[in-house]
Curated annotation (Swiss-Prot):
GO MF entry, a single one: clathrin adaptor activity
Keyword Transport: yes
Pfam name, any one: Clat_adaptor_s
Functional note: Subunit of clathrin-associated adaptor protein complex 1 that plays a role in protein sorting in the trans-Golgi network (TGN) and endosomes. The AP complexes mediate the recruitment of clathrin to membranes and the recognition of sorting signals within the cytosolic tails of transmembrane cargo molecules. Also involved in early steps of phagocytosis and macropinocytosis.
This protein's UniProt keywords: Cytoplasmic vesicle, Golgi apparatus, Membrane, Protein transport, Transport
SUPFAM superfamilies recorded: SNARE-like
Gene: ap1s2
InterPro entries tied to this protein: AP1_sigma, AP_complex_ssu, AP_mu_sigma_su, Longin-like_dom_sf
GO cellular component, one term: intracellular membrane-bounded organelle
Protein name: AP-1 complex subunit sigma-2
GO process annotations (BP): protein transport; vesicle-mediated transport
Subcellular location: Golgi apparatus, trans-Golgi network; Cytoplasmic vesicle, Clathrin-coated vesicle membrane
Quaternary data: Adaptor protein complex 1 (AP-1) is a heterotetramer composed of two large adaptins (gamma-type subunit and beta-type subunit), a medium adaptin (mu-type subunit) and a small adaptin (sigma-type subunit).
Length: 154
């Protein structure tokens, strides 16, 4: 299973987070974000969360005011992708304490760090929430210590 990209969109259509795992031009990225945003935001809530789009499959889930959107290959399992999205949201919730859109706006670098610990090159790398949270906590501790205070255990 390979993700081509992941988008977090607000209900107003603003992009809050993007991660591209396949090579696309900036023009394509902009067009894809706009097209997919329109498809997802205008879709009635009673319909399913899977869309066929070009040679890909779009899988999305709404949590509060944010849409988590993943583009993957057509042969990938939709339910596993939904579980990965839910896994990411659970980690964000534990880290931020009931994550909201403002958390992602003001702490986008931490959201990207969490995503990078979870998914690498479009593939799920870490399934343990505790491991991801421990690594993020270590990163926070490292960043909070001032210059010259970093300890490296060998």
């Amino acid at each position: 299973m390979t993700f081509h990209f992941l988008l977090l969109l607000s209900r107003q259509g603003k992009t809050r987070l993007t991660k591209w795992y396949s090579p696309f031009t900036n023009k394509e990225k902009s067009r894809f974000t706009r097209e997919i945003g329109n498809m997802v935001l205008n879709r009635p809530p009673k319909l399913c969360n899977f869309l066929e789009w070009k040679e890909y499959k779009i899988i999305f889930k709404r949590y509060a005011s944010l849409y988590f959107v993943v583009c993957c290959d057509r042969e990938d399992n939709e339910l596993i992708v939904l579980e990965i999205i839910h896994h990411f949201v659970e980690i964000l919730d534990r880290y931020f304490g009931n994550v909201c859109e403002l958390d992602l706006i003001f702490n986008f670098h931490k959201a990207y760090y969490i995503l990078d610990e979870l998914i690498m090159a479009g593939e799920l790398q870490e399934t343990s929430k505790k491991t991801v949270l421990r690594l993020i906590s270590q990163q926070d501790t490292l960043l909070e210590g001032g210059p010259g205070e970093h300890k490296v255990d060998l």
